Amino acid sequence: MAHLLTLSELSLSEINRLLDEAETFRNGRPWHPATPMYVANLFFEPSTRTKCSFEMAERKLGLHVIPFDPERSSVQKGETLYDTVKTLEAIGVDAVVIRHHEDAYFEALRHSVGVSIINAGDGCGHHPTQSLLDLLTIRQEFGTFAGLTVVIIGDIRHSRVARSNAEVLTRLGANVLFSGPPEWEDDMNLHGTYVEIDEAIARADVVMLLRIQHERHAEKMGLTKEEYHQQYGLTLERAQLMKPGAIILHPAPVNRGVEIASQLVEAKPSRIFKQMENGVYVRMAVLKRAIEGRMQHGHVVEKWHVVQ
């Protein structure tokens, strides 16, 4: 199976191939599978960008999308994730896109199901397609990753985006810095160095902001939104510290006036909405890879038709 579970399981050449494929889709080259293919999106956590961009990518590729709503499914009757995926496999689904609150939920599935699994986010663990779209956005801007300084600011401990990006950016030759409240530092993330926020922003080629993951916190945040913004947010004053040519990224949803001043969301250095656009092309590339690796009765479906 051509699963996409974490980027750490892909070689750098595989990652670059996905980015190249995404650029091909961005440039307007249409594709569709040689035979009908079916995909289901299983989102057990709320999502706007990831879910909608996967659905857009699936339709652009001519895939048949099977509706699935956990709140109206047998999950409410106690059905396990494994049995849900096996059910979809049994009725003919070829790939599943899954977002789940449990870290590494896919370990119970990867060797036990006959469909391609695409991880759309697992708890605090990984978010591979978000990292890919971030990489594509950075590459479009700078042409390379080697030697860049990427600063990730905010709720590092609870962020799957921070974990995924720090690992892959380090492998690609970037220098990763972290900044944020000390109580939200992630001792398990060894792919970056913690620095004070003003220093981080002044050194950055890429300023990547993270929202506060309230839903993953055992205790309520000790700061008000206004206090957080002043101490750890990208304020209008801090933005003046950015180098010429530095860019702002955010995986969204954006909490304006908390992690970033509202005026900066669509300011000249911001690539936040470009990230969202790139998400469709990246997910098209990921879905294409998943379907190409799909085993059907011992036959790997690899042939895709180019639509002239």
UniProtKB/Swiss-Prot annotation:
* Pathways per UniProt: Pyrimidine metabolism; UMP biosynthesis via de novo pathway; (S)-dihydroorotate from bicarbonate: step 2/3
Q: Which UniProt keywords apply?
A: Pyrimidine biosynthesis, Transferase
Instruction: Give the GO biological process terms.
Output: 'de novo' pyrimidine nucleobase biosynthetic process; 'de novo' UMP biosynthetic process; amino acid metabolic process
Name the catalysed reactions.
Answer: carbamoyl phosphate + L-aspartate = N-carbamoyl-L-aspartate + phosphate + H(+)
**One Pfam family it belongs to:** OTCace_N
Stated EC number for the protein is 2.1.3.2
For binding L-aspartate, which residues are annotated in this chain's numbering? 77, 160, 211
**Per UniProt, where does carbamoyl phosphate bind?**
49-50, 99, 127, 130, 252-253
Q: What stretch or stretches form a coiled coil here?
A: none
What EC class is this? Answer: transferase
One GO term in the molecular function aspect is: amino acid binding
Any one cellular component term from GO for this entry? cytosol
Q: Which PROSITE patterns match?
A: CARBAMOYLTRANSFERASE
User: Could you say which protein family the record assigns here?
Assistant: Belongs to the aspartate/ornithine carbamoyltransferase superfamily. ATCase family.
**Which HAMAP family is this protein grouped with?**
Asp_carb_tr
Instruction: Please give the subunit comment from the record.
Output: Heterododecamer (2C3:3R2) of six catalytic PyrB chains organized as two trimers (C3), and six regulatory PyrI chains organized as three dimers (R2).
Give the function comment from the record. Catalyzes the condensation of carbamoyl phosphate and aspartate to form carbamoyl aspartate and inorganic phosphate, the committed step in the de novo pyrimidine nucleotide biosynthesis pathway.
Quote the protein name from its UniProt record.
Answer: Aspartate carbamoyltransferase catalytic subunit
Species in which this protein is naturally found: Geobacillus thermodenitrificans (strain NG80-2)
Identify the coding gene.
pyrB
